Amino acid sequence: METENTLPKVLTVNEHPYTVLRLLGKGKGGYSYLVRDGDKEYVLKQIHHEPCSYYQFGDKLRSELRDYARLKALDIPMPALLEADIPRERILKEYIPGDTIDVLVSRGAMEPDYLRQVQAMCDCLYPAGLNIDYYPTNFVVREGRLFYIDYECNTYMEQWDFAHWGIQYWKQP
């Protein structure tokens, strides 16, 4: 895992440099950084090829791009995909500031409306034969609106849907 001392100072997307502000997180498929270009902030995701014992990947970057298109077609609220740098395996996304659901759960600040909003996403996803990664770090609330900030989606399987898997992580301890 990267630390503040090992963070790159600058990352480029299609030859355009972005100043790295901080590491936002590491997922199954990549590292996500908060980056800046002038006064505008973005998320830059760098695909990694570290092994994941519980998940099999093909081409991670192409999967992200395909999944983004599928979710966008269903109007799932998520950050806009701004650019893809295929040779460097990087994606530039809109940055959506706000608290993640895991932070809200830990603070005891979950609102019933957030569950209604994720259920509305499920109502779009399931008929299309899809699930998303319902883990609470993948959701940000901005001004009361819930956004899915990952692009991952998979073929629907009941054991991985929100009611059977995701909800357990959205509950107050």
Annotate each PLM feature.
Residues M1-T19:
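Juxta-kinase regulatory segment immediately upstream of eukaryotic protein kinase catalytic domains
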Residues V20-L23, K28-R62:
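ATP-binding glycine-rich loop module of kinase domains
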Residues Y42, P77, I91, F147-D150:
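Protein kinase-like catalytic core scaffold
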Residues Q56-L74:
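The N-lobe alphaC helix and its flanking beta3-alphaC-beta4 segment of protein kinase-like domains
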Residues F57, M78-Y114:
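Conserved structural core of kinase catalytic domains
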Residues D113-M121:
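Conserved alphaE helix
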Residues Y126-N131, R142-P173:
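C-lobe/activation-segment region of protein kinase-like
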Residues Y134-F139:
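Hydrophobic residue at the +6 position relative to the catalytic HRD Asp in the kinase catalytic loop
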